[in-house]
């Protein structure tokens, strides 16, 4: 059994427990942010066949939220920001759907293009777990571009093929 397979159930249980999260020792966000940026830059620099989006998508599937409210709660606990999602629009099948994210990580970064590929992947993986359908999520507006919120466009894979 691989190391990750041995510890994953314990980690998954811990991230769902608010008390454990609140009591855990935390890496100060600027240090963790710098660490993550170095990893993200290195992945892009090396031209990895695995993109940040794909890594995020797998992470989102592992988080396996049961519903939209749990997804919002997980994002809040991870300090990824405040999600605005209208579950009814997704259920009504009127794509593309919009998800807004306030207070995301790295909002102090100034770039010409959106920077949250990893978060887009997390959203895709989580939505797949909730709705049992494949989604593609693309960040179309970002706070790094001077916008008030990040905006993600969500499409079902079936809709892409039409």
Curated annotation (Swiss-Prot):
InterPro entries: NO_sig/Golgi_transp_ligand-bd, V4R. Coiled coil: none annotated. Pfam families: V4R. It comes from the Archaea. PROSITE patterns: N6_MTASE. PANTHER family: ARSR FAMILY TRANSCRIPTIONAL REGULATOR, DNA-DIRECTED RNA POLYMERASE SUBUNIT I. It comes from Methanocaldococcus jannaschii (strain ATCC 43067 / DSM 2661 / JAL-1 / JCM 10045 / NBRC 100440) (Methanococcus jannaschii). This is Uncharacterized protein MJ1460. Belongs to the M.jannaschii MJ0150/MJ0739/MJ0745/MJ1460/MJ1642 family.
């Amino acid at each position: 059994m691989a190391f990750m397979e041995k510890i994953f159930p314990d980690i998954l249980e811990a991230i769902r427990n608010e008390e454990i999260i609140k009591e855990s020792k935390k890496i100060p966000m600027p240090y963790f942010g710098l660490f993550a940026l170095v990893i993200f830059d290195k992945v892009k620099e090396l031209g990895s066949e695995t993109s940040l989006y794909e890594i995020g998508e797998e992470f989102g599937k592992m988080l396996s939220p049961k519903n939209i409210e749990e997804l919002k709660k997980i994002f809040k606990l991870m300090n990824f920001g405040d999600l605005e999602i209208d579950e009814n629009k997704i259920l009504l099948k009127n794509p593309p759907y919009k998800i807004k994210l306030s207070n995301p990580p790295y909002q102090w970064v100034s770039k010409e293009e959106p920077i949250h590929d990893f978060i887009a992947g997390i959203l895709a993986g989580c939505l797949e777990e909730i709705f049992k359908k494949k989604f593609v999520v693309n960040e179309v507006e970002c706070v790094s571009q001077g916008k008030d919120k990040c905006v993600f466009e969500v499409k079902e894979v079936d809709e892409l093929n039409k």
